[in-house]
Amino acid sequence: MRDGMGRLCIAKFPKPSDTDDVSAWEYVALQIARLAGICVPDFRLVRFGGRSILLLDRFDRSQAGRVPYISGLTAVQGRDGGSYSYLELVEFIEEHGSSPMYDLHELWKQMLLTCALGNTDNHLRNYGFLHDGKGRRLSPAFDVNPTQGDFDKSLSTAIDFDVRDADPRAAFGVREYFRLSAEEARHIASQTANVVARWKGLARKAGIDSRSVKEMSSCFECGKRRLREIAR
């Protein structure tokens, strides 16, 4: 669809069964990602009939037309329902990426935030690669959704081949595969923690009600705490 400015975008509507303002929380998560230095598509939140609708610009389109795109699942030659790891995306970037160092760092930042927010819907269709004429580039982050609670959450895509815990400390443990030193990873974790700490103000500016803010509090506070444990 096109928005009021004529820009090609994707509109994410709430489901009738949604009890929380899912689109608004995704909007908050995307704001956190952008403030943490993660590449995201341009996005905005609109209200219609008392419901939130998230609009995201299409990053697989340019003025010249369609930009070649494949999902992370296609990249690893996988199938729906299979079991996969971020390390398989690392291997794909190493073999096919036109800017592997940058994209490995970017993927690690995405993975770190996914862990901090308990984004358990991190299956490989929610990652993608564009073609820049020289090779593959990691796409901007999308479908970043925080999950309620501070309990242990299991990721759809594993950190490595054994660990599925949505824990930033697990992400820190595999940093070397992403060509990050301990010092670099701690710096990123510190910056990310400082942004996650702003979640409540971002939620209120997005118009999320106080009940939902209270219910999501443990998710963000736990993520912030675990990020700061890395940053020490």
Q: Which functions belong to the PLM regions below?
A:
Residues 77-92, 131-185:
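Catalytic-core segments of enzymes that bind and process phosphorylated/nucleotide-bearing substrates
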Residues 1, 33, 72, 121, ...:
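A residue-level signal for conserved active-site and pocket-lining positions in enzyme catalytic cores
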